[in-house]
């Protein structure tokens, strides 16, 4: 594992950031609340936190050096069939010949069908080394997305999905470049 990470790090500078598309998914839910808060010294922090029933959804997207691309939200866990559908219907229409699609080693990402879908679009597929979220700049974008979702505290699926769309529009190109730079690609 350490050797694979070292090899990836050594070859990062050979990858053209303008051609890279990082793909990943993250969970979002209707019970998201701020993790921290402030109150006056000696006063307890009082905040509403949902208990009981909530709904979990999966958000998947791609990150380019200048934008988030091909966002997709579903109300169930990711599996191989759903991921292939995402690739065919959302990601592939955004790909250009010569793009390099990079993803982690999730089992739903590693089928031969996934490779065929990507390569048929004229793009190349690369997998990150195992246990290497630090090489995936979309993880930083997801951290920002989740911080905004916790602050918004949406409690219904339609409101949650609308909020995700609004937050995605607030990701400027320079911030996407900073995510790439922080992960070592610029």
Predicted stretch roles:
Residues 1-186:
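Short functional hotspots at interaction and active-site rims
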């Amino acid at each position: 594992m350490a050797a694979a990470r070292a090899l990836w790090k050594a070859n990062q500078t050979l990858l053209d950031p303008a051609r890279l598309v990082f793909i990943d998914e993250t969970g979002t839910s209707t019970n998201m609340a701020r993790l921290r808060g402030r109150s006056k010294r000696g006063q307890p922090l009082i905040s509403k936190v949902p208990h009981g029933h909530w709904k979990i959804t999966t958000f998947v997207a791609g990150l380019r050096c200048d934008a988030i691309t091909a966002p997709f939200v579903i109300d169930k866990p990711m599996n191989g069939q759903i991921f292939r559908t995402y690739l065919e219907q959302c990601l592939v229409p955004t790909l250009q010949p010569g793009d390099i699609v990079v993803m982690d080693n999730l089992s739903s990402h590693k089928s031969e069908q996934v490779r065929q879908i990507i390569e048929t679009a004229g793009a190349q597929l690369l997998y990150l080394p195992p246990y290497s979220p630090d090489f995936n700049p979309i993880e930083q974008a997801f951290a920002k997305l989740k911080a905004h979702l916790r602050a918004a505290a949406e409690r219904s699926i339609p409101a949650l999905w609308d909020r995700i769309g609004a937050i995605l529009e607030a990701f400027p190109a320079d911030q996407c470049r900073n995510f790439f730079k922080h992960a070592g690609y610029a």
